[in-house]
Amino acid sequence: LPNEQDKQYIFGFAGPDDRLRARNAGYMMREAAAAKKAAGGTGFNVLALSYPHSYGGYGLSINAFKEAIAGSDLTIIGDVDEGFGQANGYKGAAKMIAALQGQSIDFVYGMDDAILTGGIKALEEAGMVMGKDVIAVGTVCNGDKQLIEEGKQFGTTLQSPLHEGQLAIKLVEEYLETGKLANYINFTPNPSVTKETIATTALRGFDGKLYGIEELCSGAW
């Protein structure tokens, strides 16, 4: 989000709600944890594969995620601060796996699916079976749809570059017509997506057209 200093140069914001997508990830993880417990499963330790902690979106995301899982059996035991992208997700997860020897990693939260995809690779190389030993939840849908379809990733949140672009154009048109925006902050939708809903997930764009998930996500979808 624009800070107070930047607002003198920016007439409005169009984009994702970091809090909402992290909250939705937390709710999905709660759902997965409840199902595991009901089936007699044990172990609810969570590894967070995060954005760099100096990045503004990190604080918004981790706090919303913690609020969403509060009161559940889930406990964060590690928070990776390696960087963006698959390579950093892999590197950070590998380091944390070594650092957490003796503790089980039962759930993984990825602040975006690119980071999570790298983390999943590191977990698998360490001998863990995704979807069985470890349950993974991500956000942003910039990873690989196949991970969800194969059950290696429980879910993600749908963040659509198409919606961000359409909303930005809509706000520019509004500003040119009226000289101001009705709302300075304008968020795009970030609904949850799981294996059960992935085939039927669709969103209506700001142009009124209906788009499927393969048109909306930016990863290997």
What are these regions (language model features)?
Residues 1, 11-12, 45-49, 78-79, ...:
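Structural recognition of the beta-strand scaffold that forms the well-ordered cores
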Residues 1-20, 39-45, 141-154:
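Flexible loop/hinge segments that line or gate small-molecule binding clefts
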Residues 1-5, 19, 52-56, 82-87, ...:
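Solvent-exposed loop/turn segments at secondary-structure junctions
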Residues 29-37, 97, 168, 172-180:
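Short, hydrophobic alpha-helical segments
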Residues 43-53, 69, 160-221:
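Hinge/cleft segment of the Venus flytrap/periplasmic-binding protein
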Residues 64-65, 77-78, 82-147:
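Hydrophobic alpha-helical
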